[in-house]
Swiss-Prot record:
It comes from the Viruses. This is RNA-directed RNA polymerase. Coiled coil: none annotated. Its main location: virion. Residues 950-997 are annotated as: Disordered. It comes from Drosophila x virus (isolate Chung/1996) (DXV). Interacts with VP3 in the cytoplasm. The lineage of its organism: Viruses, Riboviria, Orthornavirae, Birnaviridae, Entomobirnavirus. Residues 420-616 form the RdRp catalytic domain. SUPFAM superfamilies: DNA/RNA polymerases. May exist in multiple phosphorylated forms. InterPro entries: Birnavirus_RdRp_palm, Birnavirus_RdRp_palm_sf, Birnavirus_RdRp_thumb, Birnavirus_RdRp_thumb_sf, DNA/RNA_pol_sf. Its EC number is 2.7.7.48. It catalyses: RNA(n) + a ribonucleoside 5'-triphosphate = RNA(n+1) + diphosphate. Signal peptide: none annotated.
Length: 997
């Protein structure tokens, strides 16, 4: 290395390149290190003792602290439902679970740490070495200068930025800035309700049909039960092909409240039980309110969402919803609390004390329920490339494997204005003016209102959780959780910092619906922009739209002569293997990507600002990478990812990053030599933790990633499959335009009587009941009918195999009944009827994916509807029959929620998602003044008699005894039950835990 730095000819060549900067005689290493040297020190942060003053100085709203029941350890076998015992009984037989059911009350305290990570200190010297090699072999002065300017940008990025978790003061100022946006302070526009904007949820959903389309495929599950039914036993998992249908959970992420300090993987079963407690409580409360009143099945009070008045039924719906929310939040206050977590990011040193991005780390319970509602619809979202109908959506868009090429071709061929939308980002291209705009909402999360979240929920339910015929496959419990529960828990909710409970403006960033709600906001903005003629976003237009919608936004990037620059890039196409010639890279800022042209067509390159900050200020490995080998694997994947997402496009930088990756790989090989170490597992974990995991996961683990032909894998164009979006159908379950609410409820009640159980999966059961038990099946007493149906069918199914065995028969009898559709001879008449009715109808028009799931491998015939060999047909028929048998048995043994709710699934869930009140009177929390307070317990609003010390902490005491409301009596009754539960758990006394509902 010393030889190349001391070659006089190269030193002179470098001096000529930098002579205009007054550094002509300097050594290149000195120049590069000087460029990377920070010009300012990181500012001093405040202490936690100064937090109350900082909150007050920045006018941050603080709530009166809400307590929740303390955690207690309870033996798993005493807290688990029969389903949970079937799933985890053997594994957790002697273990405890941690549940928030203690008799004491707890107020959380959370103090996140803030740390600044040093930059990549070897970067200046490594770049100087590669650059000297570059100019030694270069005969093009223009290229030499251009490469130097690029390296200079990278080094300046290192001088001015650091990877850190920000500062406490930066967190406060970020919250204050969000409140400024939400409340219209300091020049911002106050958030507006839909009524103030002149729109309705139904109008917005019509826009979302175009801006956030969902495919016509049906979800893999029904949204109708507690979460433990989405986890499968080994037998069920073998048939389903997956261990569970829960949303993907990052096990290493924080569990949130009430499990403060724990990872999700550590409390997964406890969280599942607690979430089920909440779901059951909501179900019970809805039963008490929905299905009470007269015995007349057409009575609105019995079948409606509240006591309907002829004047304003929507107000009744609002009153009903508020009552349920009040009771739920008293028991589960932690579900609307999020830890205010400082996001690790590359921050400008100058912004250290003013800008720290906050992540709202939701309760695991809130995360589970919210993700379950959104997961299946989100998987089926379509975008501008995958939808057969027009959409500007970029949801699930990937620029790799031909995605960028296809998108750029749409832009190049455009004759009308092109608009694209992704979360809080929008992109507009004006072909006549040849100008590209990248637009970003100003702290978009703060613009989110509960109107927006309710509309998101209604869209997910009516588009994502309906059959192809438009029939709901969700019940009223989940409809309520989606429409009222999650919006209340995640929007204008509580952020915990120290022992302060801060009003979170808008939605908590990082909640399960962050992307969806932001996408709805941008959809509203873009449609209002369309209404005024789609003008270019000048300052006057921005002000006009912000005044109309209450949504503040800014133009992040303007690219003039955009098409011209793209065409120039295509004419200057350079192969990905060329790491000598500077490329033509066109700025787009499209989801963080720019574009160049290679042998694969238009190819994505990570935007320079993001790429250079990531190289100069690498993110340190998290605490989950504990061993020295794991940390090396993390650094290896980090450099491989940076090389493949963009560093490859910049000479000298590509060689530097490739050298780092190779060094880390060699170090790993030395460290694991003569040791047993699962390197593939470690690499997989590092890939999963990478911010570029979607890109890097396309590569193989069969050989070192730095040795693979990354360009062939990442950028080779592949066929993009297009799908039909869910059509806009005339659904008989929706209220008709000229129909009064009384007429609607009457019609729906009649429909409920005629259609007790919906969906083809219920047809055999309906037929069975009708034929075998006509009196019970057609009886007017609906409660008796439900009980009789459930008991009789369950009994028959449980005894079916035993009856066959007692007659010397096997399950082949059922199989033959399935194939022939005829009742088997020599079997009891009722049993023979049952065997035929429970045999699913066979079809020869199923897609190959269904055959693959039931065969266990793809059919040899590659046609969309494959023909099967006789052996394959037998295997398919047998597995199909067994799958349906297990599905029926599981459905009939489900928790009481589904058994009860399926009868009313069509009617009640449709009402909940169509009878939205004009304005919801959400329960509001009390705020308090923090001026001059050292802790939130001593401020005005608390009386000393309300506080008492327990275990060294100050907590709320019971209110004085007196006349109490029914809801308060219920809360105290449950508190007494929990106290008994806690005492028994502490003494080891055996007890049976009663279901909450």
């Amino acid at each position: 290395m010393s030889d190349i730095f001391n070659q006089q000819g190269l030193k002179s060549k470098f001096s000529n390149i930098v002579k205009n900067e007054g550094q002509g005689d300097s050594d290149i290493r000195e120049v590069f290190n000087e460029l990377a040297r920070p010009q300012a020190e990181v500012g001093r942060d405040i202490e936690y003792s100064e937090l109350s003053q900082a909150l007050n100085d920045n006018s941050v709203k603080v709530f009166r602290p809400q307590p929740y029941d303390e955690l207690v350890n309870i033996p798993f076998i005493e807290a688990a439902s029969p389903r949970m015992m079937a799933l985890y009984g053997e594994l957790l037989d002697s273990k405890d679970v941690s549940l928030p059911v203690g008799s004491g009350l707890h107020i959380p305290t959370y103090k996140p740490g803030h740390e600044v990570t040093p930059p990549l200190l070897t970067l200046p010297n490594s770049l100087s070495y590669e650059y000297m090699h570059y100019i030694a072999n270069s005969a093009n002065d223009t290229w030499d200068k251009q490469i130097y300017e690029t390296l200079k940008e990278l080094l300046v990025a290192q001088a001015t930025n650091r990877f850190s978790t920000g500062s406490l003061l930066g967190q406060v100022k970020r919250v204050a800035a969000g409140q400024d946006v939400a409340y219209g302070r300091k020049g911002h526009h106050k958030n507006k309700s839909f009524k103030e904007m002149g729109i309705t949820p139904y109008r917005v959903m019509e826009w979302l049909d175009e801006y956030m389309p969902i495919s016509d495929d049906e979800p893999e599950i029904t949204l109708s039960n507690t979460l433990d039914w989405l986890v499968y036993t080994p037998e069920e998992a073998e048939l389903m092909g997956v261990p569970d249908s829960l949303p993907d959970i990052t096990q290493s992420s924080a569990a949130g409240l009430p499990w403060l300090g724990k990872k999700k993987g550590e409390v997964a079963v406890s969280a599942l039980i607690t979430a089920n407690m909440l779901i059951k409580d909501v179900s019970q409360l809805l039963k008490e309110n929905l299905f009470t009143g007269s015995n007349n099945p057409l009575d609105p009070k019995k079948e409606g969402v509240a006591e309907v008045t002829t004047k304003n039924p929507r107000r009744a719906a609002d009153q009903f919803s508020r009552q349920v929310l009040d009771r739920i939040i008293k028991e589960y206050s932690y579900t609307m609390m999020g830890l205010l977590f400082p996001k690790g990011e590359r921050y400008a040193i100058a912004d250290h004390l003013t800008k720290t991005r906050n992540i709202w780390s939701a309760s695991y319970v809130t995360h589970l329920i919210g993700s379950t509602i959104s997961d299946q619809p989100a998987k089926r979202m379509l975008n501008v490339l995958t939808s057969t109908s027009r959409t500007p959506s970029l949801a699930k868009f990937s620029p790799t494997q031909g995605g960028m090429e296809a998108l750029i071709n749409i832009i190049l061929n455009a004759t009308d204005i092109v608009e694209l939308v992704y979360a809080d980002n929008a992109y507009i291209y004006y072909p006549n003016e040849d100008i590209w705009y990248s637009i970003d909402l100003t702290k978009g999360e703060a613009n989110c209102t509960r109107d927006v979240a309710m509309t998101t929920a209604m869209y997910l339910l009516t588009r994502g959780w309906t059959s192809k015929q438009g029939t709901p496959i969700y019940n009223y419990t989940w409809a309520y959780l989606a429409l009222y529960g999650i919006p209340y828990m995640t929007v204008d909710s509580i952020s915990v910092l120290k022992n302060f409970q801060i009003k979170n403006p808008g939605q908590g960033s990082g909640n399960p619906w962050t992307f969806l709600n932001n996408h709805v906001l941008t959809t509203i903005l873009m449609n209002k922009w369309s209404e005024i003629g789609k003008p270019q976003p000048s300052p006057d237009v921005i002000e006009k739209l912000a005044s109309m919608t209450g949504i503040d936004f800014k133009v992040e990037l303007v690219v003039t002569n955009f098409r011209e620059k793209l065409i120039a890039a295509s004419r200057h196409s350079i192969p990905t293997s060329n790491r000598v010639e500077p490329r033509t890279i066109v700025e787009m800022d499209m989801l963080g990507w720019d574009v160049t042209h290679t042998e694969f067509g238009f190819t994505p390159v990570l935007s320079k600002e993001r790429l250079f900050k990531s190289i100069a200020c690498p993110q340190p490995p998290s605490s989950t990478f504990q061993t020295s080998v794991a940390k090396q694997v993390h650094k290896y994947i980090q450099n491989v990812a940076l090389l493949y997402v963009g560093a490859w496009a910049y000479p000298c930088i590509a060689q530097t990053i490739e050298g780092y990756a190779l060094n880390h790989w060699n170090t790993i090989n030395i460290m694991i030599r003569n040791k047993e170490y699962d390197l593939d597992k470690a690499i997989g974990k590092a890939v999963e933790a990478s911010p570029f995991s979607e890109v890097i996961s396309l590569l193989s683990l069969d050989r070192p990633m730095h040795e693979q032909n990354y360009a062939q894998v990442l950028y080779q164009q592949k066929t993009i499959e297009k799908k039909e979006a869910k059509p806009k159908v005339s659904n008989p379950l929706y209220k008709r335009d000229k129909e009064t609410y009384h007429e609607y409820t009457t019609r729906m009640a009649r429909m409920r009587i005629n259609d007790d159980m919906v969906g083809p999966q219920w047809e055999p059961i309906i037929n069975l009941v009708t034929k075998l038990y006509p009196r019970e099946a057609t009886g007017e007493n609906q409660k008796s009918r439900e009980s009789m149906t459930r008991v009789k069918i369950r009994g028959l199914l449980e005894n079916m195999e035993r009856q066959l065995e007692s007659n010397g028969r096997s399950m082949d009898v059922w199989y033959n009944a399935y194939l022939t559709g005829k009742k088997p001879s020599g079997v009891d008449k009722k049993l023979a009827t049952l065997l035929v009715l429970l045999a699913p109808k066979r079809t020869k028009k199923l897609p190959s994916g269904v055959y693959q799931k039931l065969l266990g491998y793809p059919p040899i015939d590659k046609s969309p509807v494959p023909s099967l060999t006789s052996d394959e047909a037998y295997l398919y028929d047998t597995n199909s029959l067994e799958y349906n048998r297990i599905a029926y048995v599981s459905k009939l043994n489900e928790d009481d929620i589904t058994v009860y709710a399926n009868k009313y699934m069509v009617y009640s869930s449709t009402l909940l998602s169509n009878l939205l009140p004009d304005k919801v009177d959400w329960p509001e929390l009390r705020s308090m003044n923090v001026e001059g307070a050292s802790d939130p317990y001593q401020v005005k609003g608390y009386k000393k008699k309300e506080l008492k010390p327990r275990f060294g902490e100050e907590i709320l005491d019971d209110e004085p005894t007196g006349k109490k409301s029914s809801s308060e009596k219920r809360r105290l009754q449950r508190k007494g039950q929990k106290a008994k539960l806690q005492r028994q758990a502490a003494t080891g006394t055996t007890f049976v835990r009663k279901p909450l509902n």
